[in-house]
UniProtKB/Swiss-Prot annotation:
Pathway: Amino-acid biosynthesis; L-tryptophan biosynthesis; L-tryptophan from chorismate: step 5/5
Protein name: Tryptophan synthase alpha chain
GO molecular function, one term: tryptophan synthase activity
Annotated source species: Helicobacter hepaticus (strain ATCC 51449 / 3B1)
Binding partners and assembly: Tetramer of two alpha and two beta chains.
Record EC number: 4.2.1.20
Length: 267
């Protein structure tokens, strides 16, 4: 399946949740739907930007023994599948917290990510002023570091983040944590316009987007829709259905992605 028109979709799964195999099938289903990007979250014990749904999934993955090496194995397998199956492969993004990268070893992490077909990295808590040379090393290995712009930051801060973020900018739709519903209203549109005034890179809007009605209202406003809890919540629901075949599992995630975006499942 080739990538769909704007707004594009950035999906999200938790590596190892509810199992290694299930997280792979979930990822493949989202990719087959036509997602242009996929965040593969490496669980971290203190995910300060995440809401209850993602935090619980991360904790379960860690309790089951998740290791960074398993995350890379998942990405390597996923990369092989999507490069084989898709004319326009989904861009794979590792989403994790800075301490996990630092603990693994920055250059070792970047090199392994590159070997596994990773396109970019999002570390929500990574300060742009003190990244321990992560951006320099990532650039050396052609890995993009995507930065976040949160509400209520200054204009100068918006400009600085927009400049340093590679290729796209992740814009946080509202204050708070992931998963809580975001109201699509005048204030949000004004926030998006403010970013666009000072940033010419494509905007990925995330936090609390979980319905087609929200996506439709944002259609001409942003370039990329980021949906995290929307997928993780659905994956949690499917985890109780042990009789699902891998093919059924992938198809359900594919349909769930297409329902959010208003894409025809037969396209």
């Amino acid at each position: 399946m080739s990538a769909q028109p704007k707004p594009q979709l950035m999906g999200h799964i938790i590596a190892g949740y509810p199992s290694f195999e299930s997280s792979l099938y979930a990822a493949l289903g989202i990719c087959q739907a036509g997602a242009s990007y996929l965040e593969v979250q490496f669980p971290f014990s203190d995910p300060n930007a995440d809401g209850r749904v993602i935090e619980e999934a991360c904790n379960k993955s860690i309790a089951q023994g998740f290791k960074v090496a398993q995350g890379f194995k998942l990405l390597h397998t996923l990369s092989q599948h999507i490069n084989q199956d898709n004319k326009q492969p989904t861009r794979l993004i590792i989403m994790t917290y800075a301490n996990l990268i630092f603990h693994y070893g920055i250059e070792a992490f970047i090199k392994e990510a590159k070997k596994c077909g990773v396109w970019g990295i999002i570390a929500p808590d990574l300060p742009i002023e003190s990244d321990e040379s992560l951006r320099i090393l990532a650039k050396k290995h052609h890995i993009r570091i995507i930065s976040l712009i949160a509400p209520k930051v200054s204009i100068s801060r918006i400009k600085k983040i927009a400049k340093i973020s590679d290729e796209i900018v992740y814009v946080v739709a509202r204050a708070g944590i992931t998963g809580e519903k975001t109201h699509i209203d005048k204030a949000l549109f004004e926030w998006i316009r403010l970013i666009q005034k000072h940033c010419k890179k494509p905007i990925a809007l995330g936090f609390g987007i979980n319905s087609y009605e929200q996506v439709a209202a944002l259609k001409d406003k942003v370039d990329i829709i980021v949906a995290g809890s929307y997928f993780v919540r659905f994956i949690s629901e499917l985890s109780t259905q042990s009789q699902l075949s891998p093919q059924d599992y992938m198809h359900k995630l594919q349909a769930h992605a297409q329902m959010l975006m208003g894409w025809d499942i037969n396209e």
